Each structure stands twice: as C-alpha cells, then as structure tokens.
Amino acid sequence: MSLAVRVIPCLDVDAGRVVKGVHFENLKDAGDPVELAAEYYRQGADEITFLDVTASSSHRNTMIDVVSRTAEQVFIPMTVGGGVRTPEDVDSLLRCGADKVGVNTAAINDPSLISRVADRFGNQVLVLSVDARREKGEQHTQSGFEVTTMGGRKSTGIDAIWWVKRAEQLGAGEILLNSMDADGTKEGFDLEMIRAVRKEVKIPIIASGGAGKVEDFPPAIEAGADAVLAASVFHYGILTIADVKAELKKHGYTVR
C-alpha cells in the first residue's frame, strides 16, 4: 500500500460538548471539543472527525461554532457528520472550516442527496457514514450485513454491501464503515465486514468500531481499510496516536 494509512480520532459532540469519557490531565476542560481536537493534532492525528450527536437544527449553530474555532488551531482535515440533511448544510460546514462532511440517515432516506452534494462540492467532500451490523431477527439481506440508523437501534432492512456500492455510483468519495456489533466492545474491528465492503468498492474505507488495543489496527488495514478511526481508546488515554502509528509501521504500513 503506497498511500499512508490515516489514524483518525472521533469526537462525539452533544450540544457543544464531547461525550464519551475523556481523560487528559493536560487539558483544562476535557469536555471541550476544540481543546481535544488541538490535543490530537499535537499528538499527530492525520484527520479529526466530529460527530454531532444532537444534530437537531437548534444545535446546528453550536456545531458551526465548534468547527470554526477548531479550524483556527487545527491544520489537518476535519470531517463533520450528524444531522446533515441538505447541500446547504454541507455548504455552511465547509464555509466554517470543515474539509469533508459525513452523511448517513438523510442519504438513506433520499439517496439523491449523495449525487447533489458530490456534483456541487466534489466527491472528495462527501463521506458516507454507514452503521452496519450482522442481521438480526426478521431481516434477511444477501450479504448478511444490514444498514441501521438511530445508533444501531433501528433496522432498515437495507443490505449494507449493496448500499455502499450504490453510494459509490452516486458519488460518495469515502466510506466510514462503523460496525455496530464491534462498537464499544474493544475486541477488534469487524474484519469480515471490511473485507466484504472492500471487494465491492474502490473508494477509501475508514474502519470504525471495536478498537481496544494497538494490535487491533494492522488487521483492519490488511482486511482492506485505508484509515482507522477510534474514540474511547484515545479519549481514555489507553493509546496515543503515536502508539497506533508505531504498530502500523511495525507491520510494514506507511504512516505520516
């Protein structure tokens, strides 16, 4: 793999504050997303992902404020997702300093959103966020992986592999593949899911969900991911960005 593997911390932001515990002794306020993003920038993160978990219109301006303040201190690509429903939402986030914008539920409800955003701003701006899991109960998908919404609580019955292929055709520039089964388990990424998606799409895949120790990261790249994303292992200080990069390098992967 010639391109450098990207290591991306993810910050879940609720009403302007980071949620999921954060333990950094050197931060005045571990709940402030701008301070935390700056800390990860100092640690050598390749990108930062913000997920607006409130994502209601009432908090949209709060997120715009967070992004614009972060852009003044952090000089690596920033992706912002959560509650993005229209090309106008994308426009306002790009104007305040985001480099890429993540879409999820709105694209499931109206797939034309993908092509409208890609046509207006370019494919490189659009990250399709997919919360997928092994099917449960009544749902039967061809691949055995289905797309969920509402943080994995709501089944859609949509085949996850079919959906990523369709999104690529419509103009998505990248897939943020989050395994709802692995999420929070700290038992490693869902390698089978990554392989299944890699077989079907050419665009970059960001693997998310399940990172618990440094050894979890190289297998995700081996399975076909181009980047790795994690939240709690970084927030709790279990691992640093440098730890992950050193492990990837040890396995022969290029890192920045």
Curated annotation (Swiss-Prot):
It comes from the Bacteria. Keywords: Amino-acid biosynthesis, Cytoplasm, Histidine biosynthesis, Lyase. SUPFAM superfamilies: Ribulose-phoshate binding barrel. It is found in: Cytoplasm. This is Imidazole glycerol phosphate synthase subunit HisF. One of its GO terms (cellular component) is cytoplasm. Its EC number is 4.3.2.10. IGPS catalyzes the conversion of PRFAR and glutamine to IGP, AICAR and glutamate. The HisF subunit catalyzes the cyclization activity that produces IGP and AICAR from PRFAR using the ammonia provided by the HisH subunit. One of its GO terms (biological process) is L-histidine biosynthetic process. Belongs to the HisA/HisF family. The keyword Disulfide bond does not apply. InterPro entries: Aldolase_TIM, His_biosynth, HisF, IGPS_HisA/HisF, RibuloseP-bd_barrel. Its main location: cytoplasm. Pathway: Amino-acid biosynthesis; L-histidine biosynthesis; L-histidine from 5-phospho-alpha-D-ribose 1-diphosphate: step 5/9.
